A protein has these predicted regions:
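Phenylalanine-focused residue identity feature
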Residues: 3-5, 39, 43, 52, ...
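Glycine/Thr-rich beta-alpha phosphate-binding loop at enzyme active sites
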Residues: 152-174, 194-280, 285-313
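Alpha/beta catalytic cores of nucleotide-metabolism and tRNA/nucleoside-modifying enzymes
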Residues: 1-33, 93, 185, 189, ...
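Polar/charged alpha-helical tracts
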Residues: 29, 33, 70, 111, ...
């Protein structure tokens, strides 16, 4: 199983500026050889924004490899060894629409989604970006059920898309997939379209629903992305039931089968034990990012270190530094030496003591690379 490093999946500007600064010296080639980018992260506004798209980025950015290079100044991102998976990131679009329409129902949300995409020529932009960026695998569009939408008053809304609308959503997902495929085919031919399009299938669909979706496609999908399984509500037993529904379709024989957001320790273990393993199977997750930057400058929250072997998270504070270094000293071939890790931990502690600086953000970024390496090791071992 392979692991994709998500670039720009969360955190504030300070943390991602830290990533940019330390990338060249500290990001190992084996980890930056598989990068997941999200179209929504780059081009779509946050839920609280007044626009759907980010106008300046929409106008100026067409090549995401170039955009990534401008951020990290690393020629490697232009090489064929840097495999880029582009996720459409449509959950962000659903979040934005629902945020501005807090009482919307399922049908109205779908109509708003379609209208917004048409008005902004989103599919055309997506196809253009894929072609200009030489993306290796590009995930098609669906209308995902966001796991959590926060309204202005702080209330969380879950599952705004009703189960009874599934057939309509399935047919729309197939329609969107056909639009992407046909656009890629017009731009660069059918061989190119077949080689990059990564058709998203909702992992919670039953076998009838998967059959319905596949029957609506105007092409034979060779790469598959499985979505909707990253929610915390999908525990190991539910995940196994979902895998039972996927198994008859032999998706593991695809040239690539990617489980979106399922790179956490428990889900990776369940997926591998079920039999979905091998170089053509891949995962990603953002947990390593979030735990690395949990700590705040007020000292009321702490960043965490993941152990390669136990997979346990140890919160970083003056009492745990010795324990972390002792654990790390027994790891064979870690990303950082104990001396390098000690310097990183010192920077994290200074940040959490109210002494933030570019150097402390650099330390958090390096911690992010370590935690990502633990998740990579877990997936690939």
């Amino acid at each position: 199983m392979r692991f994709y490093f998500i670039y720009s999946a969360g955190g504030g500007a300070g943390d991602w500026n830290g990533v940019k600064r330390v990338w060249n010296d500290w990001m190992p080639e084996y980890m930056k050889s598989r990068i997941l980018l999200k179209f929504g992260d780059v081009f779509l506004e946050h839920a609280s924004g007044t626009h759907f798209i980010r106008p300046q980025r929409w106008r100026k950015i067409s090549n995401l490899r170039e955009w990534l290079f401008d951020n990290v100044r690393d020629e490697f991102v232009y090489s064929h060894d840097c495999n880029i998976l582009l996720d459409s990131g449509t959950a962000k679009a659903v979040n934005l629409i629902a945020h501005h329409n807090p009482t919307t129902n399922c049908d109205k949300l779908i109509d708003s989604f379609n209208r917004t995409f048409d008005e902004n020529d989103v599919f055309e932009k997506y196809i253009s970006v894929v072609c200009d960026s030489e993306i290796d695998s590009t995930v098609t569009f669906d209308i995902p059920n966001p796991f959590k939408i926060r309204s202005q008053n702080g209330n969380a809304r879950l599952n705004i898309l009703e189960r009874k609308s599934n057939d309509k959503l399935i047919e729309l997902s197939a329609e969107y997939s056909n639009i992407i495929y046909e656009g890629l085919e017009r731009a660069k031919g059918s061989h190119y379209a077949d080689s990059v399009i990564t058709t998203i299938i909702n992992g919670t669909w039953d076998q009838h629903e998967i059959d319905l979706f596949l029957s609506k496609l105007n092409y034979n999908p060779d790469k598959i992305a499985i979505g909707a399984l990253s929610s915390n509500s999908i525990n190991s037993s539910v995940l196994k039931e979902c895998l039972d529904n996927l198994a008859p379709f032999r998706f593991e024989t695809a040239s690539q089968l990617h489980f979106l957001g399922c790179g956490g320790f428990k889900k990776t273990k369940t997926i591998k034990e079920y039999g979905f393993d091998g170089d053509n199977i891949s995962v990603d997750c953002s947990t390593f990012i979030n735990r690395s930057i949990d700590g705040n400058t007020r000292g009321t929250a702490e960043s965490g270190y993941f152990d390669y072997i136990s997979k346990e998270l140890i919160r970083i504070n003056p009492r745990t530094v010795g324990e972390i270094l002792d654990i790390h000293s027994n790891i064979r071939n870690p990303l950082y030496t104990c001396e390098e890790l000690e310097e990183i931990l010192d920077g994290v502690l200074r940040h959490q003591s109210g002494n933030s600086s570019p150097e402390t953000y650099n330390a958090r970024a390096k911690l992010m690379f370590h935690n990502a390496d633990v998740y990579r090791y877990n997936a690939e071992s």
